[in-house]
Amino acid sequence: MSETRFTERAQAALRLAQECSAELGHGYVGSEHLLLGLAREGKGVAAKVLQSAGLEPESLKAAIARMVGVGAPGGAPSQGLTPRCKKIIELSLTEAARLGHHYVGTEHLLLGILLSLIHISEPT
């Protein structure tokens, strides 16, 4: 397969995930921030799926704040991507390739999140 590229919308969702982390005062970018970034991107396949499921960005942000807490809003997350978020990106690349796609879109990132849940629940 030729070089796989992230679409503009996928790149925007990843940037938005960083912004969400900073807004919430978290020092890392986790799967929760990626999900919120996908929802906030607004136009990609993932955003449409999330909207059709009734998951709106502000309600997701409120749920994250309740579950994880809120720190002092700041700049870029100092700790970068969590291991789980890195795994999600890896899974999205794998899924895109498996589907024969030469790009990684928001749909692949959402698939990566879902697949990471399956991997977490598997016995070791």
Which ranges hold each PLM region?
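Histone-fold recognition with a strong bias for associated Lys/Arg-rich disordered tails
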Residues: 1-121
